[in-house]
């Protein structure tokens, strides 16, 4: 089941499943515009034998915005370490997708004593060809569009972005798009 815990002045949404005595919990970090639900399939497979911790990163899912509005990678790394501390996890296997991958590898680089294993799934953080960036992200980089998107976000744009990041288009169901869209509308999640 979901729960909220206090981390860095935020009420952080997470799911902590599997055996609590697992010596190496698996911590899963989602990508941009996503939520802990990104990892539903992984958690279902892993949680019978492993402690699996999934979290909605600040400004995504049900966690909401950071009080200081600092969304730098360094701030996300500090958040991950604070989360591990709050959950009394001294060492973990850390996995990240997209933005979560960039956060994971930076956490492993700056806090190697906290990350014994690292899994990167289509991690962000390296140079991309402009044409490989989904249209939603390209538009969000434009100052005027970014400002408008804080108030208006067409569902079709969300659907297009989700389709661009899923390897199997058949997995992009209307329900999945609705979840991405609905969570993107949460106050502070488009800052």
Question: Where do the PLM segments sit?
Answer:
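Active-site loop/oxyanion-hole signature of alpha/beta-hydrolase fold enzymes
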Residues: 3-17, 57-99
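Conserved HGGG/HGGXW glycine-rich cap/lid loop of the alpha/beta-hydrolase fold
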Residues: 10-11, 16-62
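Conserved alpha/beta-hydrolase catalytic His-Asp/Glu region
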Residues: 12, 131-135, 150-191
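Structural signature of beta-strand start/N-cap positions in the alpha/beta core
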Residues: 13, 25, 49-51, 88-93, ...
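Conserved alpha/beta-hydrolase "nucleophile elbow" surrounding the catalytic nucleophile
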Residues: 30-32, 92, 96-101, 105
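Short, hydrophobic alpha-helix immediately C-terminal to the catalytic nucleophile
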Residues: 40, 81, 105-109
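Flexible "cap/lid" loop of the alpha/beta hydrolase fold
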Residues: 66, 105, 109, 116-148
